[in-house]
């Protein structure tokens, strides 16, 4: 793939990219349910052939389900696309002993059909600023049956906080420049069951992928997110070379 084609795919017309003014009661069109024989994860569509998620979501027998609101009742969904994948590519510096560089790209077997229910999200050209409002979206288990797929898609609007504020929530963690924190300090830290690797989309731009949280991000507890803008060269090079 040459650089001109790569640029074109990463800058698709607005009609095919995510509109941040979507309705709160539907699934954000960039959100993907990563279903496996183990625990599920959240993925984000950044290209008709590529999905980004956390590197710890290296899941067995993975299926990628787009356009779904209730994974526990997928037979009643009208706009679902189910695709397989060709390869998973971890960030080369990722280690299972660290929350840093926790990103993975998934190449799909076929190009996704983009429509009103399935769209790509834009990648950042500048970092999210402190106090920017972000939409964090993932699925939750209202019925507390972890042997089934989650039954509730939820979105929460929360703000980017400073490293100083983040350290009030995570006193013993090293918050690096490649990370950002989103949430409310001190937060409630109530236990809940939600699907991991939730994205933080700020002003319509994908700014972060959840790498660690002690609590429940859907209740606005502080989460630590991989800062996407730091990895744009790796993302672009990976897509170009694969």
From Swiss-Prot:
Disulfide bonds join 41-57, 134-202, 166-181, 192-216. SUPFAM superfamilies: Trypsin-like serine proteases. GO terms for molecular function: serine-type endopeptidase activity. Pfam families: Trypsin. PANTHER family: KALLIKREIN-RELATED (PTHR24271), SERINE PROTEASE 58 (PTHR24271:SF56). GO terms for biological process: protein maturation; proteolysis. GO terms for cellular component: extracellular space; secretory granule. Residues 18-240 form the Peptidase S1 domain. Keywords: Disulfide bond, Glycoprotein, Secreted, Serine protease homolog, Signal. This is Probable inactive serine protease 58. Gene3D superfamilies: Trypsin-like serine proteases. It is found in: Secreted. It comes from the Eukaryota. Glycans are attached at residue 157. Residues 1-17 form the signal peptide. Belongs to the peptidase S1 family. The gene is PRSS58.
């Amino acid at each position: 793939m040459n650089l001109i084609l790569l640029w074109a795919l990463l800058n698709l017309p607005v009609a095919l990219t995510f509109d941040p003014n979507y309705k709160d009661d539907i699934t954000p069109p960039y959100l993907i349910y990563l279903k496996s024989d183990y625990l599920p994860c959240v993925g984000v569509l950044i290209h008709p052939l590529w999905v980004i998620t956390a590197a710890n979501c290296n899941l067995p027998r993975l299926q990628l389900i787009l356009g779904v609101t209730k994974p526990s009742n997928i037979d009643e969904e009208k706009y679902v696309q189910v695709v397989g994948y060709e390869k998973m590519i971890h960030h080369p510096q990722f280690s299972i002993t660290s929350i840093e560089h926790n990103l993975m790209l998934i190449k799909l077997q076929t190009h996704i059909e983009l429509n009103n229910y399935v769209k790509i999200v834009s990648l950042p050209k500048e970092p999210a600023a402190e106090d920017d409002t972000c939409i964090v979206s993932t699925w939750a288990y209202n019925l507390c049956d972890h042997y089934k797929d989650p039954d509730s898609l939820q979105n929460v609007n929360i703000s980017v906080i400073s490293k100083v504020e983040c350290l009030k929530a995570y006193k013993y963690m090293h918050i690096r420049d490649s990370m950002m924190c989103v949430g409310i300090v001190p937060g409630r830290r109530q236990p809940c069951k939600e699907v991991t690797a939730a994205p933080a989309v700020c002003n319509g731009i994908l700014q972060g992928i959840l790498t660690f949280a002690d609590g429940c991000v859907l209740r606005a507890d502080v989460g630590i997110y991989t800062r996407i803008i730091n990895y744009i060269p790796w993302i672009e090079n990976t897509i170009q070379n694969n």
